[in-house]
């Protein structure tokens, strides 16, 4: 089995969008003479399923404040928070009857964790690992070009406070046709490891797992495929075209409705928005503000605006709002919409 790692010019890449692009590139373009193991860890990100709505699934204000990106994957499933406290083990293998058999693909990981002292780890449900009833790993797999591509996360020491805040939407009154995530009780693996492994780094944990999975003594014994510069150029292009692209990560979201209301010195505002592919598709504004002009004109200006605060503010600031909203300012309306 070949080991492929996200290392370029001797430097480890921890951008979660790049890691996802690498997985897709490997699936579609690398056909070696053996199976492939692709482990990685990355900076904080929220990864959402193909059919999910990023706005519904996440706390957008928290993500922006902490510079945590949202990345949409090409497969279904729910939203997950990932940071450098988790190792993701991915594999690309010939389908010898293993597709859908999570017990079989998980068994080497279970044995490896037992070897490291986490003897309480066990399967739960169809595709999870738990310790003391708390989820420490979730798995998925698909068929890609006749091969089984799958993987699972291993939560060594994830920041659960950040996870809870990132995956807790704080916008009320949102209705969406997207698929909602199911929250699970989660736990960390570190506290269950043997004493000699309690202080290991995420890099050391990754290497220990690789050695156990590949049945080698040291990581230097692994059979590697090093991504070439040509490989990297295609990965770069895919990352920018898709996984760093707002249109894919947000604009590809299902249609949803959004409602906010607030009170200002200039009166009350009750705003209803329909969002389609990340843009305002319909808008209705109600309230007891004192305006002279037809409010439908202002609503029309907002239609077609990208549902990002800077875009909405740019639209509002380009209009003289006084004839429509009286004393209510663009900043007040923008803050209300994105509160």
Curated annotation (Swiss-Prot):
Binding-site residues, ATP: 73, 78-81, 135, 139
Pathway: Protein modification; protein lipoylation via exogenous pathway; protein N(6)-(lipoyl)lysine from lipoate: step 1/2; Protein modification; protein lipoylation via exogenous pathway; protein N(6)-(lipoyl)lysine from lipoate: step 2/2
One GO cellular component term noted in the UniProt record for this chain: cytoplasm
Coiled coil segments of this chain: none
Residue span, BPL/LPL catalytic domain: 31-221
Keywords per UniProt: ATP-binding, Ligase, Nucleotide-binding
A Gene Ontology BP annotation from the UniProt entry: protein lipoylation
Keyword rRNA-binding on entry: no
InterPro entries: aa-tRNA-synth_II/BPL/LPL, BPL_LPL_catalytic, Lipoate_protein_ligase_C, LipoylTrfase_LipoateP_Ligase
Pfam families (alphabetical): Lip_prot_lig_C, LplA-B_cat
Keyword ATP-binding assigned: yes
EC number from the UniProt entry: 6.3.1.20
Catalysed conversion reaction: L-lysyl-[lipoyl-carrier protein] + (R)-lipoate + ATP = N(6)-[(R)-lipoyl]-L-lysyl-[lipoyl-carrier protein] + AMP + diphosphate + H(+)
Binding annotation for (R)-lipoate: 135
GO molecular function terms attached to this record: ATP binding; lipoate-protein ligase activity; lipoyltransferase activity
Membrane-spanning residues: none
CDD domains tied to this protein: LplA
Top-rank lineage group of the source organism: Bacteria
PROSITE patterns, alphabetized: BPL_LPL_CATALYTIC (PS51733)
Described purpose of this protein according to its UniProt entry: Catalyzes specifically the lipoylation of GcvH-L (SpyM50867), likely via the ATP-dependent activation of lipoate to lipoyl-AMP and the transfer of the activated lipoyl onto the lipoyl domain of the target protein.
Family according to the record: Belongs to the LplA family.
Protein name: Lipoate--protein ligase
Organism: Streptococcus pyogenes serotype M5 (strain Manfredo)
Gene expressing this chain: lplA
């Amino acid at each position: 089995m070949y080991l492929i790692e996200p290392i370029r010019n001797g430097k480890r890449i921890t951008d979660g969008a790049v890691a996802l692009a690498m997985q897709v590139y490997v699936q579609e373009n690398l056909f070696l003479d053996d199976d492939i193991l692709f482990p990685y860890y990355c900076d904080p990100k929220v990864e959402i399923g193909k059919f999910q709505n990023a706005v519904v699934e996440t706390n957008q204000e928290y993500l922006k404040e902490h510079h945590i990106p949202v990345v949409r994957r090409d497969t279904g499933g729910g939203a997950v928070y990932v940071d450098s406290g988790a190792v993701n083990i991915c594999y690309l293998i010939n389908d010898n009857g293993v597709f859908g058999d999570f017990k079989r693909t998980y068994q080497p990981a279970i044995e490896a964790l037992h070897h490291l002292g986490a003897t309480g780890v066990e399967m739960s449900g169809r595709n999870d690992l738990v310790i003391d009833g708390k989820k420490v790993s979730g798995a998925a797999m698909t068929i890609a070009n006749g091969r089984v591509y799958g993987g699972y996360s291993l939560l060594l020491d994830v920041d659960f406070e950040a996870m809870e805040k990132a995956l807790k939407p704080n916008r009320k009154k949102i209705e969406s046709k997207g698929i909602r995530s199911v929250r699970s009780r989660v736990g960390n693996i570190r506290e269950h490891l043997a004493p000699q492994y309690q202080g290991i780094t995420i890099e050391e944990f990754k290497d220990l797992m690789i050695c156990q999975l590949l049945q080698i003594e040291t990581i230097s014994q692994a059979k590697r495929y090093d991504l070439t510069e040509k490989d990297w150029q295609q990965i770069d292009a895919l990352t920018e075209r898709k996984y760093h692209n707002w249109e894919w990560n947000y604009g590809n979201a299902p249609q949803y409705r959004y409602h906010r209301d607030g009170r200002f010195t200039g009166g009350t505002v009750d705003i209803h928005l329909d969002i389609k592919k990340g843009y305002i598709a319909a808008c209705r504004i109600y309230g007891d503000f004192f305006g002279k002009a037809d409010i439908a004109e202002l609503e029309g200006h907002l239609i077609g605006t990208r549902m990002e605060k800077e875009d909405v503010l740019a639209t509002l600031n380009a209009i003289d709002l006084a004839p429509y909203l009286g004393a209510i300012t663009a900043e007040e309306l923008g803050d209300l919409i994105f509160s």
